[in-house]
């Protein structure tokens, strides 16, 4: 018997819309202060920039050649000229004499233009002769260069003092290159959120269990969500399995807090059974912002915050125990919360698009449904700009316990309820509906349609 009578309070949660739940999650997480740290450039990858970055120096810092060729004075025009020296990338041209009229210097891509040169003629527009003048080989220039031709001017890529990267930018490979270019040694970034994941229930066993006793299931949720946390850009903390007593569940929550979790995710224990303790515990130790969503799957999804010493706030998501419900609510609510605590702007929280359905879809009577679908761009042979994005609802039965229908899916199709569509019961094929593109490697593919 539990020491706490949690059911009456837990039963009192008002059902809210999926859109309202999303707004509450975003507003709550946006109000939580984010900590900033300075990381070496080598470890800043996949973090979010916390401050604007300005170029200390112009890039390039010198007039540089765009191509392999010859530095010339453009007023000399075509003709045969001696090659007086070479300007390779990395050469200090300040130590070379100015280029005199009617002479040229060999220059490589990225090499600095010497004083006296104002253009580059690419190798393809020249021909090496057998002539020698004062011990210098002679090249024939066949093109009349114009001033600054094939020259990168000082600051043409980045001007000194220019803001080259805004706070809120996710640092990926290209951003690492930019930061290295402007000489940033320590990168100011938001600390990556720490996300604790735990499963609850007496029926749950570790995935490596070879022979399951009757009534037991392998814990797919925890492994799934730990992977999803990493995909979303946070650091996962594996909290294991909390058995079905109120004390064990609360101990697991407190342990996650003590280990520095910014977000805690539990699965199971959020419905109305006599061993569903999550909502009651959260009401005692924190603030429950919602405990029931008018959506399918994921109705009992619970969102709360827990205050601790100072101004520390821990975000808590109680996800349903069915694997599909857990992963769907993760994509819809947990993933955006991770991105907010990472420091990403609102525009980066979800990738939304509109798609055309390819089959009839039965609507739920009262709840919006998030169906696992394969979304792709389809065009006719020879078409490049007139195709359309379609959603294939062929992932099998959409039961909340059937994780197999996530395999191969790359989007969640947002299907309105019958109540939303004034009593209609079926969405006909060819209807345009919103969809949410899933993260990770589930990219939108292109298919050319052949009859």
PLM region descriptions:
Residues 2-186, 384, 389, 393:
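Phosphate-interaction motifs
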Residues 7-8, 64, 346-451:
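C-terminal terminal segments
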Residues 25, 69, 102, 161, ...:
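Residue-level signal for inorganic ion chemistry
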Residues 63-65, 74-76, 94-100, 113-115, ...:
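Solvent-exposed alpha-helices and their adjacent loops that cap or buttress functional pockets
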Residues 106-108, 142, 166, 197-200, ...:
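Short beta-strand segments
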Residues 119, 125-132, 293, 301-303, ...:
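A structural signal for short hydrophobic beta-strand segments in well-ordered beta-sheet cores
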Residues 150-266:
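Phosphate-binding glycine-rich loops and their immediate beta-loop-alpha structural context
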Residues 202, 216, 222-352:
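Short glycine/threonine-rich loop/turn motifs
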């Amino acid at each position: 018997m539990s020491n706490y009578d949690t059911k009456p309070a837990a039963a009192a949660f008002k059902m809210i819309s999926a859109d309202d739940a999303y707004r509450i999650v975003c507003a709550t997480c946006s109000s939580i202060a984010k900590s900033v740290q300075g990381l070496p450039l080598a470890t800043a990858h996949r973090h979010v920039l916390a401050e604007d970055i300005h170029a200390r120096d112009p890039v390039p810092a010198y007039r540089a050649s765009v191509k392999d060729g010859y530095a010339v004075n453009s007023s000399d025009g075509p003709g045969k000229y001696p090659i007086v020296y070479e300007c390779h990338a990395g050469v200090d041209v300040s130590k070379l004499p100015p280029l005199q009229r009617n002479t040229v210097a060999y220059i490589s891509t990225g090499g600095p233009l010497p004083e006296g040169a104002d253009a580059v003629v690419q190798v393809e527009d020249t021909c090496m002769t057998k002539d020698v003048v004062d011990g210098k080989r002679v090249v024939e220039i066949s093109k009349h260069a114009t001033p600054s031709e094939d020259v990168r001017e000082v600051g043409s890529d980045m001007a000194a003092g220019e803001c080259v990267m805004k706070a809120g930018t996710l640092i990926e490979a290209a951003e690492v290159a930019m930061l290295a270019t402007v000489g940033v040694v320590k990168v100011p970034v938001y600390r990556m959120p720490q996300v604790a994941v735990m499963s609850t229930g007496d029926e749950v066993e570790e995935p490596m269990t070879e022979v399951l006793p009757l009534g037991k299931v392998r814990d797919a949720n925890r492994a799934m969500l730990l992977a999803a946390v990493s995909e979303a850009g946070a650091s996962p903390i594996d909290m294991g399995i909390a058995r079905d007593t109120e004390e064990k569940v609360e101990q697991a929550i407190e342990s996650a807090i003590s280990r520095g979790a910014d977000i805690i995710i539990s699965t199971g224990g959020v419905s109305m059974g006599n061993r569903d303790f999550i909502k009651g515990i959260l009401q005692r130790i924190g603030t429950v912002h919602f405990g029931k969503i008018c959506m399918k799957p994921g109705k009992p999804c619970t969102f709360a915050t827990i205050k601790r010493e100072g101004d520390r706030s821990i975000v808590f998501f109680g996800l349903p125990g069915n694997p599909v419900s857990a992963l769907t609510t993760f994509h819809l609510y947990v993933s955006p919360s991770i991105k907010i605590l990472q420091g990403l702007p609102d525009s980066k929280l979800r990738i939304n698009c509109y798609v055309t359905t390819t089959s009839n879809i039965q609507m739920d009577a009262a709840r919006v449904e998030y169906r696992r679908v394969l979304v792709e761009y389809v065009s006719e042979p020879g078409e490049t700009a007139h195709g359309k994005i379609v959603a294939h609802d062929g992932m099998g039965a959409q039961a909340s316990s059937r994780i197999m229908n996530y395999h191969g899916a790359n989007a969640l199709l947002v299907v309105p309820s019958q109540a939303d569509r004034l009593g209609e019961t079926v969405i006909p094929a060819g209807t345009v509906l919103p969809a949410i593109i899933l993260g990770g490697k589930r990219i939108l593919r292109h298919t050319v349609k052949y009859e």
